[in-house]
Design a protein with these regions (language model features):
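Domain-level signal for Mg2+-assisted phosphodiester chemistry and nucleotide/NA-binding surfaces
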Residues: 1-115, 127-128, 132, 181
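Nuclease catalytic cores that cleave nucleic-acid phosphodiester bonds
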Residues: 95-206
Length: 206
């Protein structure tokens, strides 16, 4: 069977960082995917969906210090990751867009709780207690279109999704209707019922 993988990059990166399973780069992601292959399986392609770092400037609301988000350590790590994926065999990189939602910031949940409980006040907050409200756009759409194209053109026999997003359910239903075997790798994350309902098997290789 020809096997195609589709990876929600933001989701997988977050899970691997939490589990500390392996150094997160193109070659190691490829090795992880290959663990899913069984006798008679061949790798068709690994589609990786993500966004480039936010390319904007702003001011931290706590200190008012200027920030160039494209030059932060997090951004530099993301650029390195994307370059690594581009250089790794069998990968197809699909990039959506990164948006800063209304230039808003999100307060750390623990700090928010401490504020409500009056254990701290606003003057106790530091720059690292807030992060910009970042949204990924067009990632789910690109994944859905690729699933539909591969399924209808019979380019692969088995699809393995590494994601936790139930928004791709319509595309998974189409793939199964077209005769593909559909698997889900949640990377040990809880699975939404509507997602597990529309796959043939669930397996994690961590």
């Amino acid at each position: 069977m020809k096997v195609v993988f589709m990876i929600d990059g933001w989701f997988m990166r977050k899970r691997i960082y939490k589990l500390k399973t392996f150094f997160y780069d193109g070659p190691n992601i490829r090795r992880y995917c290959l663990k899913h292959l069984r006798g008679g399986d061949t790798l068709y392609r690994i589609f990786y969906y993500d966004t480039a770092p936010l390319d904007k400037k702003g001011h931290n609301p706590i200190s008012r210090n200027a920030i160039n988000f494209a030059k932060t350590i997090v951004a530099e790590e993301q650029y390195k990751l994307l370059e690594s994926i581009k250089r790794t065999p069998n990968f197809a990189l699909r990039l959506g867009t990164t948006a800063w939602k209304n230039n808003r910031w999100i307060l750390n949940a623990n700090k928010f709780k401490e504020l409500l409980e009056k254990k701290i006040n606003v003057d106790d907050l530091v720059d690292s207690d807030v992060v910009p409200w970042i949204e990924q756009k067009a990632v789910d759409m690109k994944m859905g279109l690729d699933i539909a194209s591969i399924a209808t053109k019979r380019l692969a026999d088995k699809l393995i999704i590494i994601s936790g997003d139930a928004d791709i359910v319509p595309a998974l239903k189409l793939a199964r209707q077209e005769g593909m075997i559909v698997g889900l790798d949640p990377v040990r994350n809880p699975i939404a019922p509507e997602l597990s309902e529309h796959v043939d098997f669930i397996a994690t290789r961590t």
